[in-house]
UniProtKB/Swiss-Prot annotation:
This is 3-(3-hydroxy-phenyl)propionate/3-hydroxycinnamic acid hydroxylase. Pfam families: FAD_binding_3. It comes from Mycobacterium sp. (strain KMS). Keywords: Aromatic hydrocarbons catabolism, FAD, Flavoprotein, NAD, Oxidoreductase. It is an enzyme of class 1 (oxidoreductase). Its EC number is 1.14.13.127. Pathway: Aromatic compound metabolism; 3-phenylpropanoate degradation.
């Protein structure tokens, strides 16, 4: 047998799957859970033998927790978090400069949460056991990937049997092999400043919050994680080598700046790192995609590297599932880059800017900075702007898988994330809205029946796509049965948050994507025309696909953690 015929025979024996994910980090694991829930055959390829067992990311935001809720794992994640974590900034004399303590939880979860990444990653991995059609291959490195007209063929080191898939997603980190195979640039900068990070067990300070010391002598950070773990970070001066910084005596000297007995601490791990501000030239090329650190890197100062990767998975996951399942055309996948690039760029820029504010080592520059920050804090609106983290860029899609009837307006809700208050149904009380909406598309109307607004044909078309239909009412009307419809769930506005939202917007009908972005919004009379337009911009098919998404799929019940303090979730009574 010639090499060519041997290769052909091997190709015939190839393993078939729908999506190959390269990398079993948090982004790849989250994406695999999203695809698994939608019945998509998925294979994760990871060159390591097991999960990374040391902390990397230390902060989860409300959007990430909402995604973990969507995949049915938030109750597994919450025990490894510190909710409502306050972040304080101090000057070189340990006087308070600013504080971040956002009070609201409009998306259903606290905005700032410390967490232990290895334990959360382990829960994401364990969640895959629910899906017989999802496989993880540990200790396998992707050697090459060949794209064909209808898919990709992946070859793994040490495995003669190739893997055929329709799509491949590189979630393989900043040194992404997928990105290199795609021939995509990774433009940006790497800071010349180095930092020493030290993770400590049995927290020597013990308080629940975090702080950043904008000390020109040596900027530092002290971050409470969970389970008694604390992270310290110290800037390394230009005249200090990496070898010096990793010496135990140097580490003890740094820790001695913040703890009384540095020799007694239990070091989990320490390393020297630099900050990168980079973004890939393309997030999609043919049938290959990039997500997480493979697509973008940002400084740590806003804790958004991990969370940005989870946003990638949430954005791309439902689109891949819809295309693989036949509910949408391949063009829907082009909207991933269109939507995620601008927001990732904004997060990179914000994180880079905050790092520049924190890091000056010139005392005069630091003194001017301190005066400006203190002056701004005297103004109530500016103080709230920082305290409530209003500076954080929120996704607002002007293009992509969204419909704007005219030029996007700053006040239009289309392209933004919808809130997640607590609501009542006829059968349950005090449930988070997403539990009612399910895991697919949803049509939500205030005080109207979606079927009456859409008409029979459009209603049935959304139903064939697995959409759920929800009529929101004031709580006083919850048990009125005059307009009942077996396909429409009636919810009572338990907290008034829904009425408040609709009061602030002209639109009363919302078409929600599976990632809870508002794909389209309109007044009641325009529901049919906006619905029709959405089938076009979402590239949805007429037939409703292959049926994996079934409308009767049970909604995953996510109970509120018993340890969650009152007031951390929007609408908690």
């Amino acid at each position: 047998m010639t090499p060519a015929t041997a290769r052909d025979a091997t190709e015939r024996d190839a393993t078939d799957t729908d999506v190959v994910i390269v990398g079993a980090g948090p982004v790849g694991l989250t994406l695999a859970n999203i695809l698994g829930l939608q019945g998509v055959r998925t294979m994760i390829v990871e060159e390591r033998a097991t999960l990374i067992d040391y902390p990397r990311g230390v902060g989860l935001d409300d959007e990430a927790l909402r995604t973990f809720q969507a995949i049915g794992l938030v109750d597994k994640v919450l025990p490894h978090t510190v909710p409502n974590q306050i972040l304080r900034f101090f000057d070189g004399n340990r006087r308070l400069l600013a504080e971040m303590a956002p009070p609201d939880a409009r998306f259903g979860w606290p905005k700032r949460n410390g967490f232990v990444q290895p334990m959360v990653d382990a829960e994401l991995h364990a969640g895959l056991a629910r899906f017989p059609h999802v496989e993880v291959r540990w200790g396998h490195r992707m050697a090459e990937c060949e794209e064909t007209a209808d898919g990709v063929t992946v070859r793994l080191d040490g495995d003669p049997t190739p893997v055929r898939a329709r799509y491949l997603v590189g979630c393989d980190g900043g040194r992404s092999a997928t990105r290199r195979l795609m021939g995509v640039s990774f433009d940006g900068t790497t800071s010349p400043t180095r930092w020493l990070v030290v993770d400590i067990a049995n927290d020597p300070l013990g308080h629940p919050n975090s702080e950043v010391g904008a000390d020109p002598a040596r900027p530092y950070a002290s971050i409470s994680i969970a389970h008694g773990i604390r992270r310290f970070e110290f800037m390394i001066h230009a005249d200090e080598t990496d070898e010096q910084a990793e010496d135990p005596a140097f580490i003890h000297r740094m820790l001695g700046l913040l703890v009384p007995h540095p020799e007694r601490v239990e070091v989990i791990r320490h390393r020297v790192y630099t900050h990168h501000s980079r973004i890939a030239g393309a997030f999609r090329k043919g049938r290959m995609f990039l997500a997480g650190d493979a697509a973008h890197l940002m400084p740590v100062w806003q804790g958004q590297g991990y969370n940005s990767g989870i946003r990638d998975a949430a954005n791309l996951g439902w689109k891949l599932a819809a295309v693989v399942d036949g509910r949408a055309g391949d063009a829907l996948l082009d909207t991933y880059d269109v939507e995620r690039r601008k927001h990732a760029r904004a997060m990179i820029d914000l994180s880079t800017m905050v790092g520049r504010v924190i890091s000056p080592t010139n005392r005069r520059v630091a003194a001017v900075r301190d005066k400006l920050i203190r002056g701004a804090s005297v103004v109530p609106t500016l103080k709230r702007y920082v305290l409530e983290m209003r500076f954080k860029p929120m996704p607002r899609y002007e293009q992509g898988a969204v419909f704007h009837p005219e030029a996007p307006s700053p006040t239009s809700p289309a392209g933004t994330l919808f809130i997640q208050p607590r609501v009542d149904t006829r059968d349950a009380q005090n449930v988070l809205l997403d539990e009612v909406l399910g895991t697919g598309f949803a049509v939500l109307c205030w005080n109207n029946n979606p079927r009456a607004l859409l008409g029979a044909d459009l209603f049935d078309r959304w139903k064939a796509l697995g959409a759920r239909f929800v009529a929101a009412r004031p709580l006083t009307q919850l048990h009125w049965t005059g307009h009942d419809d077996p396909d429409v769930t009636v919810i009572g506005d338990r907290t008034g948050a829904l009425k408040g939202w609709f009061d602030a917007h002209a639109e009363s009908v919302l078409f929600l994507r599976p990632d809870r972005c508002i794909a389209g919004a309109c007044i009641a009379q325009r529901a049919p025309e906006v619905s029709t337009a959405l089938f076009g911009v979402l590239h949805l098919t007429q037939g409703g696909g292959n049926g994996h998404h079934g409308a009767d799929r049970p909604v995953l019940h996510v109970a509120q953690s018993a340890t969650e303090p009152s007031g951390t979730v929007a609408g908690t009574p």
